[in-house]
């Protein structure tokens, strides 16, 4: 009985200190960058909750003798439900798994059209560019109201082609744009907003990795 009470107290203490860290937001546009970091450096960078870019990411996704830079749209589509390829994805991304992971999801997509505003509600969200270059517009959580998000965390604004007279709050929006090149990975912080855009009319191959820990799944707002 005493042991059970002791364990409950320990768990409560851990949760108490984890809660503010899990829900802490960093609104700065400062960017951290590192070349192929070791696990310790990687985790320390993500714990700062800033935009983080990692270069020279060693992703090996050759499948049936085809390298990612030669994946076509149709071929990429056939990989969506391919268990063998999913295993390859998981093996490549195991290194970036959050400690005490209880949820993870991978997806590979052939990117050919710019996206609308996307609200990032996962605790750890990694985006890897496998081919060419992609442009990413990033908005911190404070910009949410100015971007006309609704209660479902969605916005119907076409930001780069919007009518600023119809949506006057857009005049106050602050954001940055970055270029993510081949074999580079970005960590988009929790509750940030982003848009993916083609760069110089290039199609890209994107790999996303979503991860939640026991604590983030339980405690995040």
Task: Give the ranges of each region predicted by the language model.
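N-terminal accessory scaffold of Fe(II)-dependent oxygenases
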Residues: 1-186, 195-221
């Amino acid at each position: 009985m005493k042991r059970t009470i002791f364990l409950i107290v320990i768990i409560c203490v851990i949760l108490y200190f984890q809660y503010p860290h899990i829900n802490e937001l960093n609104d700065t546009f400062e960017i951290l960058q590192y070349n192929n970091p070791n696990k310790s450096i990687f985790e320390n960078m993500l714990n700062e909750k800033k935009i983080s870019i990692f270069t020279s990411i060693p992703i090996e996704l050759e499948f049936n003798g085809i390298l990612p830079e030669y994946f076509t749209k149709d071929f990429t589509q056939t990989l969506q439900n391919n268990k063998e390829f999913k295993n390859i994805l998981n093996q490549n991304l195991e290194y970036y798994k959050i400690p005490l992971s209880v949820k993870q999801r991978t997806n590979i997509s052939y990117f050919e059209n710019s996206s609308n505003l996307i609200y990032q509600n996962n605790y750890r969200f990694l985006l890897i560019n496998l081919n060419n270059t992609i442009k990413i517009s990033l908005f911190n959580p404070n910009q949410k109201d100015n971007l006309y998000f609704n209660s479902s965390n969605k916005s119907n604004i076409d930001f780069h082609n919007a009518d600023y007279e119809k949506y006057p709050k857009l005049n106050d929006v602050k954001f940055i744009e970055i270029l993510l090149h081949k074999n580079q990975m970005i960590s988009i912080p929790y509750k940030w907003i982003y848009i993916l855009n083609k760069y110089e009319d290039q199609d890209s191959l994107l790999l996303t990795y979503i991860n939640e820990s026991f604590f983030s799944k339980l405690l995040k707002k």
